[in-house]
């Protein structure tokens, strides 16, 4: 069974379950609120508190469409994401405060620039969000930094999971945790499919397997996941469910976060004593890792593709100056990111392509090519 170190904690094997309190974007752009989230995570007994680092212009193209808020208001997706960026100057104060509170600071990184910024702080690990699982250039880049990597799998097919795992391993990084996850906020318990956890453990014995839970109940799915072998548990939390940000309503409040931590520790103690409890069929679901009916929409919205970042003229070579791996939002999807290195190796456009457009094969293949239908 696999194991590795995150700071002073062993993750995997017979070590205690590693509990990540996911603060995410629930700081709402307020540093004091970020400190309060760290306080809540430490007081609950979580091993780590995790934030998210991203840059809007490295996540979406400039016009990905509109997003309807809980209040029914249509807002620009790009502007919304831009407003949720965590300022770079926060990183060191948050890291120092986590040290003071004796909780490990972690962060998701969604682009190479954010990875560089986090790497400059000698991080304990990198987290890769579900919607970057197919961003193979990012996975390669982070893998080469030689830190433990945790990646989530919401909305993924098993082939996506395998390609991500294989990509990281190919760079010589074997410190990998794979998190089962469901791409719905909140996630209905009947879509938990916790049987995927032992399946992943069997399919990827060199990885540590965990569960990133988006359901609303503090203990039901997390404790069941631990009974099925999950070695990491991650769950969103907030200081107040009534705050207006996108991720507050389904997140745990501080009391519920402590309830989850206590529930997981109790479950671990029972397992050590040989006390077994059945996991409900509702939570077990299927062991087949696939994009479920409730995940298709967000997969189409958020899984990465190759997009132009500037107008490209016929005959112009593709490069990092005119294409990038981005989320489509409401735009038509571009080619899979696995083709990014191919495109930037001297391939030229066979027609004019506007900015902020998904690259398709017709942009590359000549009409008289034997590969063109």
Curated annotation (Swiss-Prot):
Annotated GO biological process:
carbohydrate biosynthetic process; glycosylation
User: Top-down, what is the taxonomic lineage of the species of origin?
Assistant: Bacteria, Bacillati, Bacillota, Bacilli, Bacillales
Q: Which organism is it from?
A: Bacillus subtilis (strain 168)
One GO MF term attached to the UniProt entry: N-acylneuraminate-9-phosphate synthase activity
Location of the AFP-like domain? 305-367
The highest taxon in the source lineage is Bacteria
Q: In which pathway does it act?
A: Spore coat biogenesis; spore coat polysaccharide biosynthesis
Q: Which InterPro entries match?
A: AFP_Neu5c_C (IPR006190), AFP_Neu5c_C_sf (IPR036732), Aldolase_TIM (IPR013785), Neu5Ac_N (IPR013132), Nonulosonic_Acid_Synth (IPR051690), SAF (IPR013974)
Q: Which SUPFAM superfamilies match?
A: AFP III-like domain, Aldolase
**Protein's recorded name:** Spore coat polysaccharide biosynthesis protein SpsE
């Amino acid at each position: 069974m696999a194991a590795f170190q995150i700071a002073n904690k062993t993750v995997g094997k017979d070590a205690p379950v590693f509990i990540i309190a996911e603060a995410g974007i629930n700081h709402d752009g307020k540093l004091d609120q970020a400190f309060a989230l760290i306080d809540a995570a430490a007081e609950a007994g979580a091993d780590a508190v995790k934030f998210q680092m991203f840059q809007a212009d490295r996540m979406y193209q400039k016009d990905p469409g509109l997003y309807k808020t809980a209040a029914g208001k249509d807002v620009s997706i790009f502007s919304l994401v831009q407003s949720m960026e965590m300022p770079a100057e926060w990183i060191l104060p948050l890291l120092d405060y986590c040290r003071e509170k004796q909780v490990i600071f972690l962060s998701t990184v969604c682009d190479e620039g954010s990875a560089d910024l986090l790497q400059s702080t000698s991080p304990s690990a990198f987290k890769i969000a579900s919607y970057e699982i197919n961003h193979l250039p990012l996975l390669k880049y982070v893998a080469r930094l030689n830190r433990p990597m945790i990646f989530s799998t919401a909305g993924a097919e098993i082939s996506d999971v395998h390609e991500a795992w294989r990509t990281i391993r190919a760079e010589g990084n074997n410190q990998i945790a794979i998190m089962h996850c469901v791409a719905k906020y909140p996630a209905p318990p009947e879509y938990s499919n916790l049987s995927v956890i032992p399946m992943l453990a069997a399919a990827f014995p060199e990885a540590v397997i965990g569960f990133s839970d988006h359901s609303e109940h503090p203990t039901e799915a997390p404790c069941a996941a631990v009974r099925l072998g999950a070695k990491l548990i991650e769950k969103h939390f907030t200081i107040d469910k009534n705050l207006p940000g996108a991720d507050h309503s389904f997140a745990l409040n501080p009391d519920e976060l402590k309830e989850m931590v206590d529930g997981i520790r109790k479950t671990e103690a029972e397992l050590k004593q040989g006390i077994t409890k059945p996991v409900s069929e509702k939570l077990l679901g299927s062991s087949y890792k696939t994009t479920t009916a409730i995940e298709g929409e967000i997969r189409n919205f958020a899984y990465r593709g190759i997009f132009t970042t500037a107008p490209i003229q016929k005959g112009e070579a593709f490069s990092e100056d005119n294409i990038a791996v981005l989320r489509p939002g409401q735009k038509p999807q571009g080619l899979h990111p696995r083709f990014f290195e191919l495109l930037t190796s001297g391939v030229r456009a066979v027609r004019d392509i506007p900015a902020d457009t998904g690259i398709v094969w017709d942009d590359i293949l000549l009409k008289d090519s034997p590969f063109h239908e």
